[in-house]
């Protein structure tokens, strides 16, 4: 357990931060390695996230982008620097400050491609490697979400709603706003775990017909699911789905999803539409919470991710949010 002092533990409990302390201690990868592979942890010289490891292999430098620094690590997301040595995070995991890379804002030079990396990758030797950001931070920027009045909806395996702010603000107390790709900005995020992963779940459990037909027509099965949505009226004839297959936004581990309102007339098409509607209503709730926290109205929504390829899904999104929604020509906005 984190080695917190008695007074510190009491304060954490009073302000409601103790569950987050326990979560970080339980989920930090460094703790797992130390506890399950102690002989490996004893040999650890540097502790890098995946982006930092790639940077090291390409340049030989222990450097990473500020906007890539997302995880269970001793990072101060408000100052966008490694946490002060007095911070409790250092006592929640075995990482020492000398193990961590230097972090630089997006646009900074992390180093140059080494001879060895050039031989292995074909990238020209000496080419500067520029700091950028995490996949989500790049996706938010790619949708043009550069202020707190534009919402970036991501319809991926993890469904999210992000806004960008120049002020640090936690949508859920003690859950940080992560660094944006634009220096000195923050991405304030709400998420639905197992979001559009549910489409994969539906395909596996109920989509054999679409899978077989898609194979014959050389299509993706998901493109045929639009026909199911079109068969069912808005509201799914009373069938409702609560999309919390996994806890989201600080919910407790007891959180579960629910499908409510079945009758003899409901079909798998009703289930699919209820699933899409339930996800969208959960994201609308996230929008309303963000607006309440920031005291700003989100006047523009841009949608990316695999789910945005569906015209029916986009129409459902517009109807439930009650506003025009936009999608880029390329749904993989992280690459933009």
Language-model-detected regions and their locations in the chain:
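Glycine-rich phosphate-binding/catalytic subdomain of phosphoryl-transfer
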Residues: 1-216
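N-terminal entrance/gating region of PLP-dependent enzymes' catalytic architecture
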Residues: 64-68, 227, 247
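Short glycine/threonine-rich catalytic loop with a Thr-x-Gly-x-Asp
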Residues: 133-134, 331-335
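Conserved catalytic-core motifs characterized by acidic clusters
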Residues: 171, 175-176, 220, 256-261
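Glycine-rich, charged/polar anion/phosphate-binding loops
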Residues: 185, 224-228, 246
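Short, well-structured alpha-helical segments that form the helix of a local strand-helix-strand
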Residues: 217-232
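Activation-segment/catalytic-loop signature of the eukaryotic protein kinase fold
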Residues: 231-333
């Amino acid at each position: 357990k984190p080695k917190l002092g008695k007074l510190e533990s009491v304060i954490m409990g009073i302000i409601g931060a103790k569950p987050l302390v326990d979560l970080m201690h339980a989920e930090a990868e460094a703790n797992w390695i130390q506890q399950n592979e102690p002989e490996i942890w004893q040999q650890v010289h540097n502790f890098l996230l995946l982006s930092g490891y790639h940077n090291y292999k390409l340049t030989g430098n222990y450097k990473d982008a500020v906007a890539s620094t997302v995880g269970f690590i001793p990072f101060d997301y408000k100052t966008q620097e490694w946490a002060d040595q007095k911070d409790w995070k250092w006592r929640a995991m075995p990482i020492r400050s000398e193990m961590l890379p230097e972090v630089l804002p997006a646009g900074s030079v992390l180093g140059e491609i080494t001879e060895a990396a050039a031989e292995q990758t074909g990238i020209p030797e000496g080419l500067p490697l520029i700091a950028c950001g995490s996949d989500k931070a790049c996706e938010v920027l790619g949708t043009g979400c550069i202020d707190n009045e534009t919402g970036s909806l991501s319809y991926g395996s993890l469904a999210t709603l992000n806004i960008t702010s120049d002020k640090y603000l936690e949508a859920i107390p003690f859950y940080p706003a992560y660094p944006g790709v634009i220096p000195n900005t923050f991405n304030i995020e709400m998420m639905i775990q197992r979001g559009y992963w549910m489409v994969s779940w539906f395909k596996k459990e109920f989509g054999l017909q679409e899978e077989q037909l898609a194979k014959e027509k050389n299509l993706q099965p998901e493109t045929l699911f639009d026909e199911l949505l079109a068969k069912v009226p808005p509201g799914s004839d009373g069938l409702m789905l609560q999309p919390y297959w996994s806890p989201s936004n600080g919910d407790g581990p007891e959180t579960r999803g629910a499908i409510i309102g079945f009758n003899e007339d409901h079909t798998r098409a009703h289930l699919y539409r209820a699933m899409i509607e339930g996800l969208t209503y959960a994201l609308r709730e996230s929008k309303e919470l963000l607006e309440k926290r920031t005291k700003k109205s989100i006047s523009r929504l841009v949608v990316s991710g695999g789910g945005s390829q569906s015209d029916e899904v986009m129409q459902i999104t517009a109807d439930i949010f009650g506003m025009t929604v936009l999608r880029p020509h390329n749904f993989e906005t992280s690459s933009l």
